[in-house]
């Protein structure tokens, strides 16, 4: 049976991650309170940030920026939006 958690991002009970997705305290915090569904949403957001901002992941400053954005996305006021991003409309 899948482990269920109260997802901090989605505000509902959902299936938990199978393992901490990042090292350290942030990874542990995400593992304990973020669902698989919310993590998939972050991966899409992260990809947009990397591409739109042309981040070089070999650069420690780019990695530090993404770690801050990860924390803001799940536990703060939301991560930065990629410039020019327009969310898809339903209908």
From Swiss-Prot:
One of its GO terms (molecular function) is iron ion binding. GO terms for cellular component: cytosol. GO terms for biological process: cellular response to oxidative stress. Disulfide bonds: none annotated. SUPFAM superfamilies: YggX-like. Keywords: Iron. Pfam families: Iron_traffic. Belongs to the Fe(2+)-trafficking protein family. HAMAP family: Fe_traffic_YggX (MF_00686). Could be a mediator in iron transactions between iron acquisition and iron-requiring processes, such as synthesis and/or repair of Fe-S clusters in biosynthetic enzymes. NCBIfam families: PRK05408.1. This is Probable Fe(2+)-trafficking protein.
């Amino acid at each position: 049976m899948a482990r269920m958690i109260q997802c901090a991002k989605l505000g509902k009970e959902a299936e938990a991650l199978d393992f901490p997705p990042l090292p350290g305290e942030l990874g542990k915090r995400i593992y304990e309170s973020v669902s698989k569904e919310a993590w998939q949403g972050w991966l899409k957001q992260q990809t947009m940030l990397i591409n739109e901002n042309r981040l070089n992941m070999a650069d420690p400053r780019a990695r530090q920026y993404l770690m801050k954005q990860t924390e803001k996305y799940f536990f703060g006021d939301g991560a930065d939006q990629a410039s020019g991003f327009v969310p898809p409309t339903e209908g």
